[in-house]
C-alpha cells in the first residue's frame, strides 16, 4: 500500500490527534455531515455542487464535546462552510478529537488555516491544515519501488523509546511494527524511527494527524519512508 496524506473517503480508520485516546482496533465512525448553504442554514445536500478538492481541511485536537454543527460554526469566521464533519469511534460513539471542514473556495480555506491553526479552544490548540487532494504527486511511483506502509518519524524527543512510539501511532490504526533507531555504541536514541501500519488509509491518517505536531517541545516529522529500488540480477 502506497500512501497519500488524508483522503476524503468514508472508509477505514482515519486521523486522530496526539492527545486522543486509543481506539480498539482503530474503530471509526464517520459522524453525520453538516452541509451549510450560502445563507448558513443546514441543508439535506440535494443539488450540492462539490467544492474544490484544495478547499478541504483537516482539523485536529478538537475538544471532545465539539460536534459537526459546532465545528461549522467555528469556521464561519473564514467564509462559507460547505461541509463540516467530526469523526467518531463507532464502538463508543465518542468524538476522536478531529474532523474535516470544506470551505467554499481555496482562498477561504487558506484564510481558515491562517485564522484557526493554533487557535485556543477550551484549552486545546487546534491543528488546521490542508488535506492533500487525491492523485497528489506525493504518491510514490510504481515499478521499481516496492509499495510500503512504513513511515519515517523524525525529530523525536530523545527520551521517546519504541514502546512510546508504538503507543503514539496505535491511536491511528493497527501498528505492525515500530522502532526507534538507537546509536550502536551508546544505545541512545538518534531522534528518529520507523513505524509500519497495516493499511494505506492508516498511513494517510497518521501522517495527516501527526506530521508537525509538537511532542515534548519538538515538532515531529512524519512522512512515507522511501523504499530502496529492487536490485536487478
UniProtKB/Swiss-Prot annotation:
Main location: plastid
Kinase recorded as keyword: no
RRM domain span: 55-133, 149-227
Record keywords, A-Z: Chloroplast, mRNA processing, Plastid, Repeat, Ribonucleoprotein, RNA-binding
Transmembrane segments: none
Subcellular location field: Plastid, Chloroplast
GO cellular component: chloroplast thylakoid membrane; ribonucleoprotein complex
Chloroplast as UniProt keyword: yes
Region ranges (Disordered): 1-52
Protein's name according to its UniProt entry: 28 kDa ribonucleoprotein, chloroplastic
Protein's organism: Spinacia oleracea (Spinach)
Source lineage: Eukaryota, Viridiplantae, Streptophyta, Embryophyta, Tracheophyta
Amino acid at each position: 500500500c502506497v500512501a497519500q496524506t488524508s483522503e476524503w473517503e468514508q472508509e477505514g480508520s482515519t486521523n486522530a490527534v496526539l492527545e486522543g485516546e486509543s481506539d480498539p482496533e482503530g474503530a471509526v465512525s464517520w459522524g453525520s455531515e453538516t452541509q451549510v448553504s450560502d445563507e448558513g442554514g443546514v441543508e439535506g445536500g440535494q443539488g450540492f455542487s462539490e467544492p474544490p478538492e484544495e478547499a478541504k481541511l483537516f482539523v485536529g485536537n478538537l475538544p471532545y464535546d465539539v460536534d459537526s454543527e459546532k465545528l461549522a460554526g467555528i469556521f464561519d469566521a473564514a467564509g462559507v462552510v460547505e461541509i463540516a464533519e467530526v469523526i467518531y469511534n463507532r464502538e463508543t460513539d465518542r468524538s476522536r478529537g478531529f474532523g474535516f471542514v470544506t470551505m467554499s473556495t481555496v482562498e477561504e480555506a487558506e484564510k481558515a488555516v491562517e485564522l484557526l491553526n493554533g487557535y485556543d479552544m477550551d484549552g486545546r490548540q487546534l491543528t488546521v491544515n490542508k488535506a492533500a487532494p487525491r492523485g497528489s504527486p506525493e504518491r510514490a511511483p510504481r515499478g521499481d519501488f516496492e509499495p510500503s506502509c512504513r513511515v519515517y518519524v523524525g525529530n523525536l524527543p530523545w527520551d521517546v523509546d519504541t514502546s512510546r512510539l508504538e503507543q503514539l501511532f496505535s491511536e491511528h490504526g493497527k501498528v505492525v511494527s515500530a522502532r526507534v533507531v538507537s546509536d550502536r555504541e551508546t544505545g541512545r536514541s538518534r531522534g528518529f524511527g520507523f513505524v509500519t501500519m497495516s493499511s494505506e488509509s492508516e498511513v494517510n491518517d497518521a501522517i495527516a494527524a501527526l506530521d508537525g505536531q509538537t511532542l515534548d517541545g519538538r515538532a515531529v516529522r512524519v512522512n512515507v519512508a522511501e523504499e530502496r529500488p529492487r536490485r536487478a540480477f
